[in-house]
Amino acid sequence: MIGLIEGRVCHLSAPVACLMTASGVGYEVELPLPDFCQLQLEAMASLWTHLHVREDAQLLYGFLHPTERDVFRQLIRVNGVGAKMALAMMSTFSATELKHCIDTENDAALTRVPGIGKKTAQRLLIELKGKFDHIQSDMSLLTEVEQQIGIAANSEGVILAEVESALISLGYRDKEAQQAIKAARETDAGQQLVDTQSLLKLTLKQLSNF
């Protein structure tokens, strides 16, 4: 089992990062979008990983904090929740926000995640009750020192396409992704668009308000 990968971030294509280890092996890892946005091209990174084996592929999912990985593993144990849906949940909510949704039985909030309807949300509330009690409400799930994000894409069109592609890969509909991107770009910060990660962060905030 591959539990932790440390290496240089040699490629970023939301929501997948490729880390080149000291042994010369490059690992492709899919991350929740908030974690992806913390990575910097050519910088060193450490990711806690979960290996997901399918008949046709072996996929690595990565997280900046081991508690996030624990949350992911709890999510995929729920009947009807696969790795893609779990990743979409962790791209929509932080671990502490997910805990709050479960503790307060807020199924309406959970239905904001692509692919989660009323029945699935209620199943999540039942099967996850008490599973996140080890998560403290004031806990930070990011690394101790967050890296500055400053990765310039080739053009504005490339940035927009990458952000939309990342959202669609998580299950958001084309129109929903485009509306969120449009709303993000209309903010003061969005008008100073410089890179894919920054726009992803803004767009995720907009989606949480929809």
From Swiss-Prot:
Family classification: Belongs to the RuvA family.
One GO term of the biological process aspect: DNA recombination
Species this chain originates from: Psychrobacter sp. (strain PRwf-1)
Renumbered residue ranges of the record's region Domain I: 1-64
Coiled coil: none
Name of the protein in question: Holliday junction branch migration complex subunit RuvA
GO MF term list: ATP binding; four-way junction DNA binding; four-way junction helicase activity
Signal sequence annotation: none
Biological function: The RuvA-RuvB-RuvC complex processes Holliday junction (HJ) DNA during genetic recombination and DNA repair, while the RuvA-RuvB complex plays an important role in the rescue of blocked DNA replication forks via replication fork reversal (RFR). RuvA specifically binds to HJ cruciform DNA, conferring on it an open structure. The RuvB hexamer acts as an ATP-dependent pump, pulling dsDNA into and through the RuvAB complex. HJ branch migration allows RuvC to scan DNA until it finds its consensus sequence, where it cleaves and resolves the cruciform DNA.
Residue ranges of the region described as Flexible linker: 144-154
Subcellular location as annotated: Cytoplasm
Start and end residues of each stretch annotated as Domain II: 65-143
